[in-house]
């Protein structure tokens, strides 16, 4: 089996690092393809060294362009590389333009796509990432869903449950892996104050003067904390444009930094009192490291963190930002609940599950793209109440059907093969020639 891994940004590299470790451990042949969406070549090489990863076999170097130009350049470069490499599967991770391009090119070449972090949905189509997620998943052959909620999103969109593997999220594996490296390599000096780590880069916040002003004025009032703010270049540009940067620079409790290296940032995050962010990945990292998270957005494709109690959506609401942070500070029971929120993303073995599932597909001859054999058959989709003691697997085998979704009362459930269906309703597909 040969795996081609397509990555383009720092978060993708971070989340795929434990998957690469697992592939290497099993001596599986693989090719690492870096599209170069975020970094110049030299910076990228240093990042791979810091995380103790092998250098990419291919570097496309698309750089920063419009979404259309970046996707087109990536697709053009990938097509030639995949013709040369001839992988059995192309793995992509997340929701970037590299994911979109990788999924489109591979599926057009009839190479199976494995999407790590499949099924995430914000249901906000103004976000380019949401478009990338949806389109990539329509091209995907193996869906590595991080949670059951993500798996259900895929089922509702018509994905076959046989191709959905609930793995947990590799961010847990990555945090555990990379924090060990950070403690060895990071040279950042951390103060003993109550640190609030702040990151902000999304267009809906930094391009909107009203929202940005509201967030900044909240920060200025939170002088009982030490707020450490590694400022993204685009964010700084807009802060200066809207005459807000000098206000932050004058505040003694706010420390403005240049963007930190990943290992330094991870160590900072792990020692924080709380985190304020509009990043999707940071919501996952915070709950993994038991750090209370306040998300500067009104929606999230990581709703599991909110439901678990480790994340609160505060948007750009000045009062809500201030009140929530003060509640965390003053109500120790509330703070403990956030710190001890159960991690919805698993036990740190997502990478192992991903490679196990991929090898199982390969061993069974299921890593193939071919037309369905029953394309001319009559599909009947039925809702049934199951009154007998029987599992999903046994029902499918006996009635030659495919259970799509299980309803336990009013709540949908993923149809795990060993699930007992007695007293539950199922939606199942039956093919009749």
Task: Label every PLM stretch briefly.
Residues 4-7, 12-24, 47, 59-160:
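Active-site and donor-binding regions of nucleotide-sugar-utilizing enzymes
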Residues 28-70:
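Conserved nucleotide-sugar phosphate-binding/catalytic loop shared by glycosyltransferases and other
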Residues 92-93, 115-116, 143, 267-305:
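A donor-sugar binding/catalytic signature common to diverse glycosyltransferases
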Residues 140, 272, 401:
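An anion/phosphate-binding loop that grips the pyrophosphate of nucleotide cofactors and donors
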Residues 38-42, 139-211, 314:
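A nucleotide-sugar donor-handling region in carbohydrate enzymes
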Residues 330-386:
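C-terminal amphipathic helix plus adjacent low-complexity
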Residues 37-40, 45, 65, 181-271, ...:
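Donor-nucleotide binding loops and adjacent catalytic segments primarily
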């Amino acid at each position: 089996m040969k795996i081609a891994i397509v990555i383009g940004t720092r978060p993708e590299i971070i989340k795929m690092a434990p998957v690469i470790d697992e592939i290497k451990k099993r001596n599986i042949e693989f090719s690492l393809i870096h599209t170069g969406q975020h970094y110049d070549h030299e910076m990228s090489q240093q990042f791979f060294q810091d995380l103790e990863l092998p250098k990419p076999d291919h570097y496309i170097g698309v750089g920063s362009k419009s979404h259309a130009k970046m996707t087109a350049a990536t697709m053009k470069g990938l097509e030639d590389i995949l013709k040369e490499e001839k992988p059995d599967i192309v793995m992509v991770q997340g929701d970037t333009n590299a994911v979109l391009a990788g999924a489109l090119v591979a599926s057009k070449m009839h190479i199976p796509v494995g999407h790590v972090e499949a099924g995430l949905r914000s249901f906000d189509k103004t976000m380019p990432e949401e478009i990338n997620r949806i389109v990539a998943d329509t091209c995907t052959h193996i869906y590595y869903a991080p949670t059951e909620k993500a798996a259900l999103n895929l089922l509702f969109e018509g994905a076959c449950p046989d191709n959905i593997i609930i793995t947990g999220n590799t961010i847990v594996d990555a945090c555990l892996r990379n924090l060990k490296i950070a403690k060895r390599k990071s040279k950042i000096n951390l103060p003993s104050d109550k640190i609030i780590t702040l990151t902000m880069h999304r267009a809906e916040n930094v391009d909107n003067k009203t929202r940005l002003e509201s967030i900044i004025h909240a920060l200025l009032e939170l002088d009982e904390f030490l707020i450490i703010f590694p400022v993204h270049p685009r964010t700084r540009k807009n802060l200066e444009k809207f005459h807000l940067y000098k206000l932050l620079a004058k505040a003694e409790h706010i420390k403005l930094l240049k963007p930190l290296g990943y290992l330094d940032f991870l160590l900072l995050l792990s020692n924080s009192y709380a985190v304020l962010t509009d990043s999707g990945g940071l919501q996952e990292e915070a709950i993994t490291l038991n750090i209370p998270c306040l998300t500067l957005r009104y929606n999230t494709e990581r709703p599991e963190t909110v439901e678990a109690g480790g994340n609160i959506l505060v948007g750009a609401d000045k009062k809500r930002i201030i009140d929530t942070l003060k509640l965390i500070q003053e109500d120790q029971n509330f703070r403990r609940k956030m710190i001890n929120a159960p991690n919805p993303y698993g036990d740190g073995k997502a990478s192992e599950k991903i490679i196990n599932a991929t090898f199982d597909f390969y061993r069974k001859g299921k890593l193939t793209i071919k037309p369905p054999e029953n394309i001319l058959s009559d599909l009947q989709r039925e809702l049934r109440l199951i009154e007998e003691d029987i599992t999903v697997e046994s029902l499918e085998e006996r009635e030659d059907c495919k259970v799509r979704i299980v309803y336990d009362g009013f709540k949908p459930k993923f149809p795990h093969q060993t699930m007992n269906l007695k007293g539950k309703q199922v939606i199942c597909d039956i093919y009749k020639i």
